[in-house]
Amino acid sequence: MMDTKALRQKILDLAIHGKLVPQDPNDEPASVLLERIKAEKERLIKEGKIKRSKKSAKSSDTPHYENVPFELPNSWVWCRLEDIAYVASGSTPDKTCFVENGVPYIKMYNLRNQKIDFAYHPQYITEEVHNGKLQRSRTEVGDLIMNIVGPPLGKLAIIPTTLPQANFNQAAVLIRPYKFKEVLVSYLKVYLEEMSEINSIATRGSAGQVNISLTQSQNMRIPIPPLNEVRRIIEEVSKYDILIDSLKQNITDIQNLIAYTKSKILDLAIHGKLVPQDPNDEPAIELLKRINPDFTPCDNGHYTFDVPSGWITTNLGSIFNVVSAKRILKSDWKHSGVPFYRAREI
């Protein structure tokens, strides 16, 4: 059976390495795209709509990447996520801030199948808290939300039009490109779903938790293609997603058909309808006498179906030695010796 998850992973891998669609030498280089995005970021800073991070203020205009994970096509460039997008983490207000009706408050259980499912255990906060204490994490339609506390990491979803305003908790960050938002959000979702960058920066905490900090999120290394190539990548990935979804459905249909067929065959078998009866066959009662001369035959009358002529019913103990096992103490377990099977090994 085809592994659709591995197939999609391969598509994403090709996409982020610049191998899914051909490069066009006539495309405007990604370096020009990056400068246009930076210019928009500066405009937003001057207008007071966003703040310049302390790290960005100290950085030079030319980023240096000593540890880039792979080589890019000539027309691509590396950048940090915060070079092209506003990145902010959420937080959890006091219990008194939650209300029955108010501003939708997204929790990580609402990120289901890479979409926002706010109908699942919805929670709301007051307008005052949304526009006050939690104003930095106010979402907009089209923002990308990524969880930063796992396992699992890699839950990503785009804020839908059904949530014109919302907020979220501290287990996630929002990603809002400064320019070309729709196309870059789609591209960033493809890149981050590939998981290699997320896995490379994740740190393991207590009790098996896996985390990414806000700073790590802002500094994630992003390979940027030319804008036209970004569009081609998104279009190609979308085509493959449709194909993979169709394959998944076909596989599910086949599995359901196999399960139904197996059940039907077993049903026919136990009702004596799978193969024809032969009147010359020795009756089943003679077989039981040879297995256990002391067997007790059962009355067939309580069965909901007619037992074929030549068949007979009996209890399991008449033809099998049925025994139960005992629990083994932990001190009795050995690395070698007689195999001991538990229910989970069957």
Residue ranges of each PLM-predicted region?
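A short glycine-rich beta-alpha junction/loop motif
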Residues: 152, 165-173, 186, 205-225
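Short, well-ordered loop/turn sites that connect or cap secondary structure elements
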Residues: 139-140
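Short amphipathic coiled-coil heptad-repeat segments
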Residues: 1-25, 31-32, 42, 50, ...
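Short, ligand-facing micro-motifs at secondary-structure edges
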Residues: 92-93, 112-125, 144-147, 151-168, ...
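Amphipathic alpha-helical segments
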Residues: 16, 76-77, 184, 188, ...
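Low-complexity, Lys/Gly-biased intrinsically disordered segments
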Residues: 46, 63, 77-116, 130-134, ...
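Non-catalytic DNA-recognition/assembly elements of restriction-modification systems
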Residues: 10, 19, 64-91, 227, ...
